[in-house]
Regions:
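Short beta-strand element of the alpha/beta-hydrolase
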Residues: 76-85
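C-terminal catalytic histidine-bearing segment of alpha/beta-hydrolase fold enzymes
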Residues: 219, 229, 233-236, 240-282
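Catalytic nucleophile-loop/oxyanion-hole region of alpha/beta-hydrolase
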Residues: 90-99, 110-148, 262-265
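Alpha/beta-hydrolase active-site loop signature
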Residues: 86, 114-118, 180, 255
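The feature captures the conserved acid-bearing segment of alpha/beta-hydrolase catalytic domains
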Residues: 172-175, 187, 196-237
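Primarily recognizes the serine-hydrolase "nucleophile elbow" in alpha/beta-hydrolase
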Residues: 131-193, 201
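N-terminal cap/lid segment of alpha/beta-hydrolase-fold proteins
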Residues: 18, 22-73
Length: 282
């Protein structure tokens, strides 16, 4: 389908440096390195304290593994979290802290990894997320995870979470700071490793796919880069025009990295949003 997303006014005349900067969250947030280091430290401690169901393989790749944090009840809802890094950076272990608030609130949590570009194409990455969900449906109960699944993800993981709403196992999604139209990414330096093809852009841009009539909350930080904010707003408007459920949630004062705290804290607005997605799914 034709994408309802359009590039910014004058995009064709932008320099390559300007296009790259439009999606460069690390440079766009002054203290990004400190925030990442803090998240990694918190995640290392959390993971060490919850080591019972880690490194569970769902595929043959080294990164194709789950870390599961089961609730006291196997039938508790499960929040799946998919990490970001523009499909080419980061690892699931450094996002373990994302389970803290949900686990305290009675959810189970699953954090899955996936093979990164350039080793994996976008097509392979999307397939790995679907394989991870298939594994969770088949084997999660053996690890105490058998409840309804809400898929969540941040940045590139927001893109993957939006696509993860399609499989039957998943009742809804929380997409945070995501990319929903891939075409502009192909015109930035991020594509040096992604090597996106026109067919992949068409097939794996959530905004071009048939609208999923499940609740998908779409969140972003109010202080994100303009293009990240716009991607979220356009995707939400596209879904709303198709009467698809799900809130648009700009998180006040949050940049691209600080927005994660709204999910990992038990009183966070995005953890509440995940609960609202679950309730809306019925």
């Amino acid at each position: 389908m034709t994408s309802p997303y359009t590039t910014p006014e004058g995009w064709a005349g932008w320099t390559q440096a300007a296009r790259d900067a439009a999606y460069d969250n690390l440079k766009g947030v002054a203290d990004s390195a400190a925030q990442v280091a803090n998240r990694n430290t918190l995640s290392e401690a959390f993971r060490a304290a919850h080591a019972g169901h880690l490194d569970l393989p769902f595929g043959s790749g080294a990164r194709e593994q789950w870390d599961l944090y089961p609730a006291a009840r196997a039938d508790a809802p499960c929040l799946v979290f998919i990490h970001g890094g523009y499909w080419q950076r980061n690892r699931r272990e450094d996002f373990a802290i994302m389970a803290e608030g949900a686990l305290a609130a009675g959810w189970s949590v699953g954090i899955c990894g996936y093979t990164l570009a350039p080793e994996a194409s976008m097509t392979r990455i999307v397939a790995e997320i679907h394989a991870a969900l298939d594994w969770l449906g088949a084997h999660g109960a053996a690890h105490g995870v058998a409840g309804k699944v809400v898929a969540s993800g941040w940045s590139a993981g927001g893109h993957l979470a939006a696509l993860a709403a399609e499989p039957p196992l998943v009742v809804g999604a929380l997409a945070m700071s995501g990319i929903y139209e891939l075409a502009p990414i192909a015109e930035t330096n991020l594509n040096d490793k992604l090597h996106l093809t026109p067919a992949e852009i068409a097939a794996h841009s959530p905004i071009r796919r048939p609208v999923v009539q499940k609740p998908i909350a779409i969140a972003y930080g109010a202080r994100e880069l303009p293009e990240l904010r716009r991607q979220s707003r356009v995707f939400h408007r596209h879904r709303a025009e198709a009467q698809a459920p799900g809130a648009l949630i700009p998180v006040p004062e949050a940049d691209h990295f600080r927005v994660l705290e709204a999910l990992w804290r038990q009183d966070g607005v995005l953890l509440r949003a995940a609960a609202e997605v679950l309730a809306a799914a019925g």
